[in-house]
Amino acid sequence: MQLSDFSFELPDELIARYPLETRSASRLLHLDAKGQYHDHMFTDIIDLFEEGDLLVLNDTKVMKARLKGKRATGGAIEILVERMLNHTTAYCHIKASNSPKAGAELFVGADNIPVIVRGRHENLFVVEFSQPILPVLEQYGQLPIPPYFNREAEEIDTERYQTVFHNPEKIASVAAPTASLHFDEELLAELDQKGVKKTFVTLHVGAGTFMPVRTDDITNHVMHSEWCDVPQETIDLILATKARGNKVIAVGTTATRALESAAQAHGGKIAAWTGDTQIFIYPGYEFCIVDRLITNFHLPESTLLMLVSALSNRENILAAYEHAVKDRYRFFSYGDAMLIDKLEV
């Protein structure tokens, strides 16, 4: 399967660079189990879900992971914290005119907090901070909004690039689980009133989510690693949902990858799991848990577009995307949403 099989034309003006005034005011394109698409508003999910269905949400929180700084010589640098190893050490991306060597001292924030490059880990730098990382990020960091916004993070992003249900103790992502950004408290309350249940998994989203696929044959692509947790409480609800004939609805590709990683770790069995995942889902993958998926519109030739193509099929997804472009849907993180049903075969 070739990378070019997942290409489509997207006018630049359809990239949503700011959120709508109201979270749940987005549009929704429903791709049903027969491969037919239907236009809705996002709030129509109330009518598209059944009592007893189960929403699975990712409760991670986005860090203010981007730090501006300088070398001892004064040259500008930028650090993006990818993963904290402990309170003062992290794997980081570093942008600089020349790649810093082990032992290099850098300074971040307005107060020039010292950090030291201790070495490399694959394509990342191991960086030791002179102070606890999270308070430094909170005081001096910026939210690492996606590169296709083509702007700096602003005050509006502080609220709107986080989900309303994030767990403040689980602050470790460098990107939001964007399908969840459409849910506000009012919509969640309406779903609860209807009898749609919800549960949580955790997947801390890494910067690799924005990395392009660089192999023509997609099966040669190696996914970045992300930490996830699928607790027993969630598994119990999933098993009960399936036992009564209801649907498991993953909210976002991150929740999907967490759930399917847990199943793959147990040979396809639905069971709890915690660990690092590099799961790569593309057409031909057999889903073990997910019946329906809420997701945003994704970049051409991205692993996320390949994932959604596995749930329906490539032709159906690209036809739906072509319709979305013609009908002026908004794309990417702050854009509109899709509800994709597993294709009936």
Curated annotation (Swiss-Prot):
The keyword S-adenosyl-L-methionine applies. Its EC number is 2.4.99.17. Gene3D superfamilies: QueA-like (3.40.1780.10). Pathway: tRNA modification; tRNA-queuosine biosynthesis. It catalyses: 7-aminomethyl-7-carbaguanosine(34) in tRNA + S-adenosyl-L-methionine = epoxyqueuosine(34) in tRNA + adenine + L-methionine + 2 H(+). It is found in: Cytoplasm. The keyword Disulfide bond does not apply. One of its GO terms (cellular component) is cytoplasm. One of its GO terms (biological process) is tRNA wobble guanine modification. InterPro entries: QueA, QueA_dom1, QueA_dom2, QueA_sf. Keywords: Cytoplasm, Queuosine biosynthesis, S-adenosyl-L-methionine, Transferase. Pfam families: Queuosine_synth. One of its GO terms (molecular function) is S-adenosylmethionine:tRNA ribosyltransferase-isomerase activity. PANTHER family: S-ADENOSYLMETHIONINE:TRNA RIBOSYLTRANSFERASE-ISOMERASE. NCBIfam families: PRK00147.1, queA. Monomer. Transfers and isomerizes the ribose moiety from AdoMet to the 7-aminomethyl group of 7-deazaguanine (preQ1-tRNA) to give epoxyqueuosine (oQ-tRNA). Belongs to the QueA family. This is S-adenosylmethionine:tRNA ribosyltransferase-isomerase.
